[in-house]
Regions:
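A structural boundary/capping signal
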Residues: 1-217
Length: 217
């Protein structure tokens, strides 16, 4: 594959100290940025941590420019939940690094919703909160990151899904996005020093503390 051959050539120049060479490598990597993860899987030898860091630094300007260009895309979607998911996907992909695309988050959320349906069927808002946040069989899928509450990683939903840790806002977002795939209306509620989800079950409105095991109040 031509792209893989080109990448093999470029990786030999990643540590070149010439600014002219670095600019040329940056342009080539930027041009193939969306295909890079696929090309990496086809390399005979994976990139070393040092090479990955070099690629990240070279792609950083292009990633920032792209973020600025696509940021307002969410405004053209219908509905507050799709808008929020698009904006969150963009932020999370930027935080997650150059290998990640915004569209990857929707795929992970689809997978999570499919697992929830396979295990719990068509759950209501209370049942879904329990599935996501309560301890069941010794397993808690998502819980509050009490040890590192202010870490920026809590705003990266790729990291939150991978680790099961998050802050109130990111955990409520997970609940809202999965709920939307179940046909549930999950809103948000600002609270002094906190953030809660808002749902209706059997005609009654509830506040849900996703950071505290999905407690209904």
């Amino acid at each position: 594959m031509p792209g893989v051959l080109q990448l093999n050539h470029l990786r030999k120049l990643l540590d070149d100290e010439s600014e002219v060479v670095r600019d040329a490598v940056r342009r080539e990597l930027t041009g193939m940025r969306r295909e890079l993860p696929q090309f990496l899987e086809l390399l005979d030898e994976p990139l070393t941590p040092e090479e990955e860091q070099a690629v990240a630094e070279l792609l950083e300007p292009a990633r920032r420019t792209e973020m600025e260009e696509i940021w307002m895309r969410w405004r053209w979607l219908e509905g507050s939940t799709p808008q929020l998911e698009e904006a969150t996907s963009q932020i999370s992909a930027f935080l997650d690094g150059w290998k990640t695309q915004p569209g990857d988050l929707g795929l992970q959320l689809d997978t999570l919703a499919r697992v929830a349906f396979e295990e719990g069927g068509r759950m209501n808002a209370h049942e879904l909160a329990e599935w996501l946040f309560a301890q069941r069989g010794g397993i808690t899928r998502f819980r509050g990151n009490t040890k590192d509450y202010y870490s920026p990683l809590n705003s990266n939903l790729f990291w939150v899904i991978e680790t099961g840790l998050g802050n109130p806002l990111s955990l409520c977002s997970i609940y809202r996005f999965i709920g939307q795939r179940f046909g549930l209306d999950v809103g948000g509620c600002n609270f002094p020093g906190h953030f809660l989800a808002r749902v209706q079950v059997d005609g009654k409105e509830w506040l849900v503390d996703c950071f505290n095991r999905g407690k209904f109040m």
